[in-house]
Amino acid sequence: RKEGCMSLALFYEGEPLYQIMFWLAKNKTDGKNVIYIGALQGPQNGNELIKGMTKAFFGYRTKNLMFYGLRCFAKAIGVENIFAVTNDGYYAMNHVRVDRKLKTDFGAFWQECEGVICSDRRFYIMPTAEHRKSMEELKPSKRAQHRRRFAKMDEMKAAVKAAVDSYKK
């Protein structure tokens, strides 16, 4: 359970882009199902692929798309809380380079996704749903792009739910 027993991977044109490692557990305080994220890994040399995927999702960042996919999975299986590892909580600190600089700053990303450090300082508590701006909040020049992006994200959510439901039968 160091990084996770399960993973969700994001591919574009048959090539892996991101992988998120996690495990399922029961919340110690209320017994509800939770997900603990142990790691989020991106590609070594995937800049062109990332650009392609970002374009395919109308400007939505691939790292955010990966986390959105996990949120869709969590909703489909009835998870009510998601906890994401902090930089300090990451067991191996493998994301620290030889020169001691972070390769990946988990904290910055989780905070960007509205995560808040919880009482167990090794984890952020993450919202299970992503905030979407209303069309009125967006510049008129960005509305069509966001409408297409949200439609694509809704397709992804439906596909994840259908895949999970097929295993429930």
Predicted feature residues:
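Non-catalytic substrate-recognition and accessory regions of acyl/acetyltransferase enzymes
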Residues: 1-52, 141, 145-169
